[in-house]
Structures are given as structure tokens and as C-alpha cells.
Amino acid sequence: MATPNIDWAALRQAANEAATHAYVPYSKFRVGAAALVDDGRIISGCNVENASFGLTLCAECAMVGQLHMGGGGRLVAVTCVGNGDHVTPCGRCRQLLWEHGGADLLVEVEGVPTPMTVLLPAAFPEHSNFDNQTKN
């Protein structure tokens, strides 16, 4: 696959803007995520904490919600910031990003565009659980 023309600075700016909207009364750790969609849109999301930390919504999850609210599509490139610095998506979010961008999705890691195959080399295949259930 050819590398698309990605304006990483614009994505970082969108992620930083998203982080300003984070609801973080407990950790004070503001996270923003932004992505380029295959139709050219830039989408973003912020983290939303909960007193029960396990229920905290990661910025990447909010961003994927925005993807679908805007009509869907495939993620091409993603960047995440936490309190203004690069952060790498957690394991749950890596799987979520794989579902919506696949192996060719690029994620900025410490300023370096990194394919999802490096971040999540043994990803759970999309729809595999449901495909297996329908075969039985």
C-alpha cells in the first residue's frame, strides 16, 4: 500500500484541541486522539473518566464513536496526546483501532508513523468470533 499524504502536525493539533475537552477530575491526565479518515475527514475524541476507573472512556474510543456518527469509514492515520506529549494507545484501544483501520493503519508513536502490525502483531481478527458462531 502506498503511504498516504498525512499532515501529522494537523492531527496533533486536533488531538491537543480534543484533549482540552477531557473530563479528568481524578487523574488530571488529559488525553486527545485524532485520526485521518479515508474520505479525508479529521476526527477526534477525548478521554472521559469515571470514579470507577475501569469504566473510563479512552480518547480513542470517543474518536471511533465520532467516526460512526459522521458516517463511518476507515481510519488511515492516528495520533494521541496526553497532557501535550505523545502517548501510545493502550491494548484495548489498539484492538479497537485495528477493527476500524486494519493492518495498514498508521499510528504515530514518539513522532514515528508505525503500522498497526507492529503495535498489535497478533490482533484478534475482525468479525472472527461471529463468523465462527454462524458456522456452527
Can you annotate each of these PLM segments?
Residues A2-A18, G70-N136:
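C-terminal binding/interaction regions
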Residues L36, Q66-G71:
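Alpha-helix C-terminal capping segments
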Residues Y23-Y26:
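Short Gly/Pro-enriched turn/cap motifs at secondary-structure boundaries
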Residues A14-E17, A59-L67:
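Short, well-ordered amphipathic alpha-helical segments that serve as non-catalytic structural scaffolds
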Residues N47-C61:
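Compact, glycine-rich, soluble single-domain proteins
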Residues K28-V37:
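Short beta-strand scaffold segments in enzyme catalytic cores
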